[in-house]
Structure formats: C-alpha cells, structure tokens
C-alpha cells in the first residue's frame, strides 16, 4: 500500500462519504421539486377545464330556465342554440344565441349573443377550451326534446391534456300564452 505524504492532496474516505450523502439529499430534493412542478401544472390544467365547463353551463342554464322557446340546430353539435322569452312584468323580449366560434384545432369558444327588444346585439365569450373533435372524449353538444321539454347539454372542455365532461338537463319554465 502506498503512503501519502503530507503535501499530497486528496480526499479521505470520510470526506467522500459525506460528499455522497450531500449529493443524495440534493438530488432527492431536486427530484421532488420537478415532480411537484409537473403535478401542479396538471392540477392547474384540470381546474381550468372544470371551471370552463361550469361557467359555460351556468350561463346557458340561467338563460334556458327563462326560455319560452328553444331552437337547436339539426347539426351534430346542436349549435347555434337560440333561446327566446318575454318577461312577464314589463313585456321585454329577449333572444339569446349560443354558438361555438373561433376554432383553434378541436377547441372552440362559446359565444353568447343577447338581443333585447330587437336592439343592438351584445356579444360575450362565456366559455373557452370547448372541445368539438374526434371522439373520445365526448363532444360538446345540445339537444332539445320536444316531448319532455328538456334541453340536454353536453359540455366537454380540454385544457392541456386534461379533459372534463359534464352533462346538464335543463327544463325551461312553462309557457303560458
């Protein structure tokens, strides 16, 4: 075995073991941070998908509950969805149209256009990341049943790789003519 002289530089076994232990702790912490960042991004995308589905359904639900007349397109999506009603107290007429617009691949925005007393249309976007594409997942669509008077709304949103699908059944107020 070779002897080390006093001026000779090198690491002892204890120093190597301490360095290895520190390196292991740093690598473990780095790995945990990377996993947390990936999970956080996925959770954030999932929350965006849920919130967009809920927001779009909420607006359609509010208008559909008031509707005295519901019209859906005969296309596979059922859009545009047109809701008409007249208020009982003031006789104000409303026409609200929902349509899927501004496609970016399979993702659309849900546009709401409101016309009060045949006036100027007010247009807003009430939902984003609305999915209409090859299945799966299920496509966004709406259907009106003339027998049961129920509007069935299927909303699918996709944010990143996260997909959220919801089905709503809405029964508008009865029309008394």
Pin down the residues of each PLM region.
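Residue-level recognition of strand-loop junctions within catalytic nucleotide-signaling folds
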Residues: 19, 84-86, 158
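Short, well-structured beta-strand/strand-turn elements
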Residues: 65-74
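Type IV pilin-like appendage domain
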Residues: 73-146
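Aliphatic-rich helix starts adjacent to a transmembrane/signal segment
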Residues: 2, 8-61, 65
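N-terminal cationic leader/targeting segments used for protein routing and processing
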Residues: 3-7, 118, 147
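Short linear sequence signals and composition-biased patches located at protein termini or domain-edge surfaces
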Residues: 131-177
């Amino acid at each position: 075995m070779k002897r080390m002289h006093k001026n000779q530089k090198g690491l002892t076994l204890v120093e190597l073991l301490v360095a290895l232990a520190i390196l292991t702790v740093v690598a473990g912490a780095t790995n945990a941070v990377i996993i947390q960042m990936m999970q956080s991004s996925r959770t954030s995308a999932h929350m965006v998908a849920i919130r967009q589905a809920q927001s779009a359904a909420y607006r359609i639900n509010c208008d559909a509950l008031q509707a005295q007349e519901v019209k859906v397109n005969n296309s596979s999506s059922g859009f545009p969805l047109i809701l008409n009603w007249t208020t009982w107290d003031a006789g104000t007429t409303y026409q609200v149209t929902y349509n899927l617009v501004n496609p970016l691949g399979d993702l659309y925005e849900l546009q709401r256009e409101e016309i009060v007393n045949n006036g100027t249309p007010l247009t807003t976007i009430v939902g984003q990341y609305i999915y209409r594409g090859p299945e799966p997942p299920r496509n966004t669509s709406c259907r009106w049943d003339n027998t049961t008077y129920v509007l069935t709304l299927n909303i699918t949103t996709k944010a990143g790789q996260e997909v959220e699908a919801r089905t709503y059944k809405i029964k508008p107020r009865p029309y008394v003519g």
